[in-house]
């Protein structure tokens, strides 16, 4: 039961009703005996400043931020963590007295999972997209030492992202390069790792990305659910970092930032996989 003592958390996005974050975070709160609740908050882009300010005024303790607000919310933060500043996007807000502190747990989660799946320094990698999620993925790939090529429907966005992340490339590692969207298939064929940072797969009617996946390739998809890319990766025998794994890991990192407690990650993963949960 929600009372005047219940700590409030939520996720801002548009669309956001499909989000599995509420049941995942609710399971973690319940497991640790915390009096807290987490809700999905649909917010259209033009209402984002009012929503962020209103959530602070209403006493929310923390927020996640999802499509399409991850870049726009940066300007609404009182302070921004160095990683989020490098990424140029924020997906987690933590309350301070004066406002919100912004973090990017997408980026940290992606880096951890890519390393766990054996992404080697110097590996050629292809990223599809240049929006908020793609920025987190690009940061993770560069920090992991991959030789990154970025393809986006808007070539200027891919070029801008490549230029911004270039200074982060390690000694001896080539800076990221933007490539045409039309070269996606050929670039994927040459890559050891392929990451989808677009929203392709979010809607059932979405056409798949125009690329092939092969056995042993490392494939990561920021969209969760039975996406075309996830199916292709499983069918081909690729190493898959699914959207669910990214969701759970970033959610666990957000939980720790908000509460100062280690998140029950296995339980959170089980919560989003349970029958009857939102998809």
Swiss-Prot record:
It comes from Anaeromyxobacter sp. (strain Fw109-5). This is Shikimate dehydrogenase (NADP(+)). The keyword DNA repair does not apply. Shikimate binds at residues 19-21, 66, 91, 106, 224. GO terms for molecular function: shikimate 3-dehydrogenase (NADP+) activity. Homodimer. InterPro entries: Aminoacid_DH-like_N_sf, NAD(P)-bd_dom_sf, SDH_C, Shikimate_DH-bd_N, Shikimate_DH_fam. The gene is aroE. One of its GO terms (biological process) is aromatic amino acid family biosynthetic process. Keywords: Amino-acid biosynthesis, Aromatic amino acid biosynthesis, NADP, Oxidoreductase. The active site is at 70 (proton acceptor). Its EC number is 1.1.1.25. PANTHER family: BIFUNCTIONAL 3-DEHYDROQUINATE DEHYDRATASE_SHIKIMATE DEHYDROGENASE, CHLOROPLASTIC, SHIKIMATE DEHYDROGENASE.
């Amino acid at each position: 039961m929600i009372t005047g003592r219940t700590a409030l958390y939520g996720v801002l996005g548009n669309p956001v009703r499909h989000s599995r974050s509420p049941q995942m975070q609710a399971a973690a709160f319940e497991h640790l005996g915390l009096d807290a609740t987490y809700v999905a908050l649909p917010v259209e882009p033009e209402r984002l400043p009012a929503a962020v300010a209103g959530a602070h005024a209403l006493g929310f303790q923390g927020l996640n931020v999802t499509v399409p607000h991850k870049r726009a919310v940066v300007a609404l933060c009182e302070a921004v963590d160095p990683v989020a500043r490098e990424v140029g996007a924020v997906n987690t807000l933590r309350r301070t007295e004066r406002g919100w502190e912004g973090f990017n747990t997408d980026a940290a989660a992606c880096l951890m999972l890519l390393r766990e799946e054996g992404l080697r320094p110097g590996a050629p990698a292809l990223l599809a997209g240049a929006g908020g999620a793609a920025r987190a993925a690009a940061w993770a790939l560069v920090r992991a030492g991959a030789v990154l090529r970025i393809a986006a429907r808007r070539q200027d966005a891919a070029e801008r992202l490549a230029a911004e992340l270039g200074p982060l490339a390690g000694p001896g590692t080539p800076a990221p390069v933007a490539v045409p969207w039309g070269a996606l298939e050929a670039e994927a064929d040459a890559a050891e790792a392929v990451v989808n940072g677009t929203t392709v797969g979010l809607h059932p009617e979405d056409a798949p990305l125009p690329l092939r996946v092969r056995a042993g390739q490392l494939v990561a998809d920021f969209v969760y659910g039975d996406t075309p890319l996830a199916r292709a990766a499983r069918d081909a025998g690729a190493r898959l970092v699914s959207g669910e794994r990214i969701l759970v890991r970033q959610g666990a990192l957000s939980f720790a930032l908000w509460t100062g407690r280690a998140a029950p990650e296995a339980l959170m993963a089980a919560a989003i996989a349970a029958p009857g949960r939102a998809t």
